[in-house]
Each structure stands twice: as C-alpha cells, then as structure tokens.
C-alpha cells in the first residue's frame, strides 16, 4: 500500500530553513552545555500496585502533589506490600536494589508508597478476611506501609517517605 504525499501533508513535513536553523541551534546548545542533555532532576519515586484500577488515580495523585513528570515509577503487585510482606520475600531484593539505583541515577529526595483498597496481593499476603473487614484491611495495609517506611529509613536515611492507602475512586488516606 502506498501513500502519496501532498505539499501540506503532516506525516512527512518538509524542513523549512527556519526549522533547520532551530534544529541546528538545539544541537549546538546541547553540545555546548552537555548537562542539559543529562537526566532531569527527579523529585521522587512512586511505588504502587500493578492493578490497573489505580493507575489513573496514582498519576493524578502525583500530579496534584507537584510531581508531574518528576518521578520514577516502580510497579509491583501490592506496591509497598510487595516490597515488605513475607509472602513476597523473593521480590524484596529487586525493590531495594531498584531504589538504590534510582537514588544514584535520579537523585530523588522522596519515596511515595501507595497501597490500595481491594488489593489481591494484600489478600495473598495477609489473608482473605481483608476482603470483608475494612478495619482489618486498613490495619494490615497501614502496618505494611510503616514497615516500608522503616525499611527506607534504614537503607536510604536521607529520603523522605509519604505513604497512603488509595481508595478505588483515587482518594488517598495518608498513613504516617
């Protein structure tokens, strides 16, 4: 199948003299100031669950807290639960190693750890009773978030940590 281009076709726009000059200028600036081509200075790392029901809420939460496009993202079943629960012990090293390299490469200052309501990984880690007992669900997730916070304080003491439990509507209950 062929595609014929006409002069106004946007898929293969011709580069004008002005466009060529802009491209050359951008290249010259990058060559003159290589730091501009390096990593951006990220502020945080978001650690949350693989559940697609919380993806949009997580992005919205980070943007609302001033982190839009300023954070790295570690996604694992259960989020912080996956990093600390004994049921997922085989995963722990992967998370802590990833946090260390994120600090090294991105110079982050903070970790945001979000669990969420009705989390299958939380049920695996702490029992099916969490499905029907919201108080128990809150207690177990809060305990996991405090363990997560303590683990970060031990391994990366310069980092700040924010933790919370996200409802499926995107609202977050802060856990200190």
Give the ranges of each region predicted by the language model.
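Short, conserved "active-site rim" segments that organize catalytic pockets and cofactor/ligand binding
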Residues: 23-24, 38-92, 166-172
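Short HxH-centered metal-ligating active-site micro-motif
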Residues: 2-3, 69-132, 137
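MPN/JAMM (Mov34/JAB) isopeptidase/deubiquitinase module and associated MPN-bearing subunits/adaptors
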Residues: 4-10, 154, 160-176
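A structural motif corresponding to the C-terminal end of an alpha-helix
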Residues: 105-106, 148-161
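Solvent-exposed alpha-helices and their adjacent loops that cap or buttress functional pockets
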Residues: 36-40, 65-66, 104, 154-156
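Short, flexible loop segments at boundaries between secondary-structure elements
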Residues: 139-149
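N-terminal secretory signal peptides and thylakoid transit peptides that target proteins
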Residues: 4-27
